[in-house]
Amino acid sequence: MLQMVKQISFIFTAILLCSCNHLDIKGMFVSSSVGVQTRFEQSIDMYPDLNAGVIEAQESYTFYVAADPHVDKTHQNLDIFNDKFRNDGEASFGVILGDCTDVRDNLPNYLQAIDFYPERHDFDHKVFHVLGNHDIYFNGWNDFKSKVGPSTYWFEVVFPGGKDLFITLDTATGTLGSKQSRWFKDFIEKHRQSYRHCIILTHTNFFYTDNSQSSSGNMPMEESFSLIEFLGNHEVSLVLQGHDHYREDISYKNLRYIVLGAIADKSK
C-alpha cells in the first residue's frame, strides 16, 4: 500500500513539474482565481446596478439554453446548438449555464464558437453567459470578466403589457457568499412583484450536496435549504442549472428546478 502511495505521489508530482498551459493539473485543483465575494464586488464595479439590459419580445417567447460546453479542441455540439439558435426567428436570446471552457486560455475559442456569423446565421441573437467552476480555474476569472463581463447580473424580457425578470447568480465556487446572497434576497424582496415571471440562471445546482464535482463541489446543505425555502416563498418561477452533467426536472413548493445535461462533445 505504501509503495502504491509513493508511486501515485511520484506520478502526480511528475505531472505537475512537466505541465504546460495545456496540462496544468495544479490549476485544476487549486484555483488561483479570486473568491466569490471579490467576484461580486468586481461585478458591481462593471455594472453598478448589475443591470445587463433589456430584451424585447412577445408575450409568449422562446429562448435557448445549454450547459457545460467545456470547449477544448472541438465544439461540434455547441456548433449545432449555435446554428439552430441563430437560425430560429422565434428565439429571443440564448443562455449558456457555465463551464464554457476546459483548458487555460481557451475562452476566445468558446466565444468564437458561440458567435454570430452572417454567412451561416440569420439572426444575431444575444447570448447571456453564466460563470462555472471550470471557468475560474487557471486564473480564468480575469479572462472571463474582461471578455464576457460580470458573474452576477440581471436582465429583463419586456413584452406588450408586462415583463419577466432573469437573474444570473455566481455559484462557481459552490456558494453565493454573504454579499451576493444579501443583494439577491434584497433585490427579490423589492422587485419580484413588478414582474410576471422570475427565472434564476446559475451553474451549480441547489439539490445535489454530495460533492459530485470533486474540487468545486456542490452547495452546502444548509445554504441550499435556506435558498430553496426563500425561492419558494417569493414566487420564483423557474431555476435553470447545470454542473452535474445529468438532466433532472424537480418541482418543489410550486417552483420548477431544471438541471441540464452537458452539451460538451464528450457527452454525445
Residue ranges and their predicted role:
Residues 1-9:
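Bacterial N-terminal signal peptides that target proteins for export
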Residues 9-17:
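Bacterial N-terminal signal peptides
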Residues 21-109:
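N-terminal active-site segment of His-dependent metallophosphoesterases
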Residues 32-55, 106-197, 217-238, 246, ...:
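Extended active-site neighborhood of metal-dependent phosphoesterases/phosphodiesterases
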Residues 63, 94, 166, 198-199:
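Hydrophobic beta-strand anchors of alpha/beta hydrolase catalytic cores
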Residues 68, 98-99, 132-133, 203, ...:
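Active-site glycine-centered loops adjacent to acidic/histidine catalytic or metal-binding residues
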Residues 71, 101-102, 135, 206, ...:
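Short active-site segment of divalent metal-dependent hydrolases/proteases
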Residues 191-211:
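Short acidic, glycine-rich surface-loop motifs adjacent to enzyme active sites
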